[in-house]
């Protein structure tokens, strides 16, 4: 039966010229291969090769004009933070390092210096206004100042001269009290702007003068 099928196939198929293999310089090119026609049972089994498309690559692999070999591939991303990815067009925030911190410190110091200079200028401008109105000195009367102060350094005591007001007040006190207590001496010294020693000496001299005058009066009476 196999021989019958083979004979029937041989009779129905037309004479086909032998296929001649040609040597081609470029194996990737299919245009140089001749088309062949085959028939089986009245069916056309011819093989046709489409014209090749322009290619920029070797070994029949097409490459687009775009330098990116894989256009569908997503852009490279950089992890800016955990769980967040940045694209190529996005700029990842830079972490300021030691050099950036050092560069920022001089700017802060300059701002602090400038603010300090401004405050000093304001203080200087405010001073003349305060100096234009000096506080009035307290009024001091003559008996409030300590007079007859010795400034000599030779060891000799200078003779104390009392004012009329001081002499009058001391005479009044001597008329009532010929001997003063220490507490009373301090009060008189403060009132007359004298020291305790000056009051004590004045009363000693005044008592001696009073005794001398009393003796002379007693002699005249005899």
From Swiss-Prot:
PROSITE patterns: ANTENNAPEDIA, HOMEOBOX_1, HOMEOBOX_2
Chain positions of motif Antp-type hexapeptide: 140-145
SMART domains: HOX (SM00389)
Keywords of the record: Developmental protein, DNA-binding, Homeobox, Nucleus, Transcription, Transcription regulation
Gene Ontology annotations for the cellular component aspect, listed alphabetically: cell junction; nucleoplasm
Residue ranges of DNA binding: 155-214
CDD domains linked to this entry: homeodomain
Superkingdom to which the source organism belongs: Eukaryota
A Pfam family: Homeodomain
Predominant location: nucleus
GO BP terms: anterior/posterior pattern specification; embryonic skeletal system development
Molecular function per GO: DNA binding; DNA-binding transcription factor activity, RNA polymerase II-specific
Disulphide bridges, residue numbers: none
Biased composition (Low complexity): 74-85
Biased composition (Basic and acidic residues): 107-122
Segments of this protein annotated with the region Disordered: 68-141
Record localization: Nucleus
Task performed by this protein: Sequence-specific transcription factor which is part of a developmental regulatory system that provides cells with specific positional identities on the anterior-posterior axis.
Family statement: Belongs to the Antp homeobox family.
Protein name per Swiss-Prot or TrEMBL: Homeobox protein Hox-C5
Protein's gene: Hoxc5
